[in-house]
Structures are given as C-alpha cells and as structure tokens.
UniProtKB/Swiss-Prot annotation:
Mg(2+) binds at D35, D103. It is found in: Cytoplasm. Keywords: Cytoplasm, DNA damage, DNA repair, Endonuclease, Hydrolase, Magnesium, Metal-binding, Nuclease. One of its GO terms (molecular function) is magnesium ion binding. NCBIfam families: PRK11617.1. Belongs to the endonuclease V family. One of its GO terms (cellular component) is cytoplasm. This is Endonuclease V. It catalyses: Endonucleolytic cleavage at apurinic or apyrimidinic sites to products with a 5'-phosphate. The record marks Y73 as: Interaction with target DNA. GO terms for biological process: DNA repair. It comes from the Bacteria. It comes from Klebsiella pneumoniae subsp. pneumoniae (strain ATCC 700721 / MGH 78578).
Amino acid sequence: MDLAALRTQQQQLAASVERADRLDRDPPALIGGADVGFEQEGEITRAAMVLLTWPELELVEYQVARVATSMPYIPGFLSFRETPALLAAWEQLSQKPDLLFVDGHGISHPRRLGVASHFGLMIDVPTIGVAKKRLCGKIGDLGDEPGALAPLMDKNEQLAWVWRSKVRCNPLFISTGHRVGMDSALMWVERCMRGYRLPEPTRWADAVASRRPSFVRWQANHS
C-alpha cells in the first residue's frame, strides 16, 4: 500500500473540489442519502443509498451494494475503502438525485478529501458531508441547546459547521462535499430535519443499511 501516492492523489483531487453552489436543479426534485458499513469482519463493504422526494422527504427508492473490501482500514484514507461500494450502489439507482448527503466528512479532512468530497468528484454531483465525529480542526464554543452552532476551524480555514441538531445529542459535522457551499450545506441539512439527530437522507440510508424497524415498516407498506 503506497500511502505516499494515495496522499498525493488526495491532494490533487482536493484541489478539484468545488466549494461553491452548483446545483443543476435548484431546488432539487430528489435528494439522496448514502451510508457505508462493513460486514463479515470487514471483508465486505456495504453501501446503502436512498432517494427521497423534495420537499416531502418521502422514501421512493433504495439500493444496497456489497463489494469485497479492497483495502484495510487506514485513518485518513477511508474514502478509498468506501467509494467502490458507493459507486456500485449509485449505479443501481434507477434515477439519480440532484443533491446527495453522505454519512461522513467532506472537506473537513486533514487533506480536505473526505468520502463526501471524493465521491462527489467521482460522480460530479453536489454532495454534503454529514459526519458524527470530528476528524481534524478545532471547534469554537458550542452551546448545549438544540440549534447551537460553531465553526470547525483549521488555522484560518473553516472546514465545517458543528451543529447540535437535537437536545442531549452529540453535534453533527456538516461540510461541503462538492458543488455545495458551506452555508448551503448547513441550510439543506436543517431543511431535511424531521425531529431526529440525523437529517432524513442519511437517517434513511442508515435505516436501510441496518434494516431498522422504520425501514422494515416501510417495506411492509410498499410490498
């Protein structure tokens, strides 16, 4: 595993990330959500992808792809491990979303190329990173109340918004993936909340991936 070459590739790709809004359809008709996990002790990478209508946020399609894991877990290089399964799930979708939420980081990454940015570049679709844990950078003062907001900074560069979406919950790290500005990323996440910690696109992707009761009920109603 030539990490130096991968690091160089990350830096080159990161330079191509568009940090301003460029949605082909605004407002979007379909918003996607993507979530990646691992099965069989990491040997299989599983990606779940969902499509929701906007503004209703109703689930209209889901796909799950499983591929053999192509590289080990190496912090900072997770996107190389996750994108093959994401691409497989993406290609299975009968329609493509106008905006995609990815469970993971966008530019809030040591080399500014988290999975949301990497995958957004691969498919050239507007993406937003919605991560649950900090990867790098420093958080400003963040209140305990729901809606509390602080920037995630690295020196003078803002990497994400840190946003407490729900009371007594850890905050989310919301960042530009590709073709979505930082403030727009936050705005779209806020618009896609329905009372849970996660926005609906990644909440549904997680529900599909983990076969949570909400998804099992949805399947029963749509069979």
